[in-house]
Amino acid sequence: MESLMASSTLPPLFADEDGSKESNDLATSGLTHPEGPYGSAATSTTNPEFVEDLSQGQLLQSEASNAVEGNEQRPEDEQRSKRGGWSKGRKRKKPLRDSNAPKSPLTGYVRFMNERREQLRAKRPEVPFPEITRMLGNEWSKLPPEEKQRYLDEADRDKERYMKELEQYQKTEAYKVFSRKTQDRQKGKSHRQDAARQATHDHEKETEVKERSVFDIPIFTEEFLNHSKAREAELRQLRKSNMEFEERNAALQKHVESMRTAVEKLEVDVIQERSRNTVLQQHLETLRQMLTSSFASMPLPGSGEIPTVDTIDSYMNRLHSIILANPQDNENFIATVREVVNRLDR
């Protein structure tokens, strides 16, 4: 009797599947048969059609469970394939840059930043670089449209200049050489993709193992406490290093500002000295011309040399030597020299 009841309750387990509706109907008809509440249940269990429906229901249920497991497994595989990144220890190669290409145009915002950054740093040297960038961004957003348009117009003109120069450059031989280099590099890159994929896959496995080893530590254990202490000590050391680097950076920034001020002062001194040298050079040329014209009628005793603008310096040296060597023999000549010098003083 209990086996008949058990066999009559099996079909409803597969009522959700399409292939089990017939078996459910068979069980229901067995329960409502006029011979008794369990009269046809035994018959349905021995019926081959019922057994076939039952096996079909089990097969459909197993296929549905496999499909659900496959759907759950697929996002994990996709997520695992998307995970990754650049392998540790590898450096991204910089893209090829054509040194012969025309200079890229600057936007209006970049032009404004370049113009105002140095002015703001000169006024407020203690402000860090990120704060200066933020302040300039706010200043740009509040800039009147007519002032902002000036930078945008300059950017448009620079863009037109770049397009013209680029069009001319693309017709040169240097551009063709750079294009061939780029194509050769792309071919080499395609050969390295397989090795890069393998390295990425190995890195993913290594990362998973590390994550699993860290997250598998049970909490509230001695191992977990030691791990937490090690992490806290590492964080303290990093904070300490960060503070030291910030202090060094601030000291270097002050040193740079002081050096910049000293350089500016030296540049001002150099300009002043150059102007002073120019004035002295002009005065020296004027004095040479005056001496040449004054002593043009006074040849040196013994040699008879007459001064010119080019030889006035050597003439004056020899004149001085003659006066000191024989002052008694050249008294008349010395008196004439005194008269000429007195006229120069006037």
UniProtKB/Swiss-Prot annotation:
Q: Which residues form a coiled coil?
A: 228-272
Compartments where located: Nucleus
Q: Where is the composition biased (Polar residues)?
A: 1-10, 55-65
User: Residues bearing Phosphoserine?
Assistant: S104
Annotated region (Disordered) at: 1-112, 178-210
UniProt keywords (A-Z) are: Chromatin regulator, Coiled coil, DNA-binding, Nucleus, Phosphoprotein, Transcription, Transcription regulation
| Tissues expressing this chain | Expressed in brain. Detected in mature neurons.
For the keyword DNA-binding, the answer is yes
Q: Where is the composition biased (Basic and acidic residues)?
A: 71-81, 181-210
Determine if Nucleus is one of this entry's keywords: yes
- A Pfam family found in this protein is HMG_box
Q: Which domain of life is it from?
A: Eukaryota
The UniProt entry's GO CC annotations, sorted and at most eight, read: nucleus
Comp. bias regions, Basic residues? 82-95
CDD domains tied to this protein: HMG-box_HMG20A
Q: Which residues bind DNA?
A: 102-170
Describe its assembly: Interacts with DTNB.
Q: What does this protein do?
A: Plays a role in neuronal differentiation as chromatin-associated protein. Acts as inhibitor of HMG20B. Overcomes the repressive effects of the neuronal silencer REST and induces the activation of neuronal-specific genes. Involved in the recruitment of the histone methyltransferase KMT2A/MLL1 and consequent increased methylation of histone H3 lysine 4.
Q: What is this protein called?
A: High mobility group protein 20A
Q: What is the lineage of its organism?
A: Eukaryota, Metazoa, Chordata, Craniata, Vertebrata
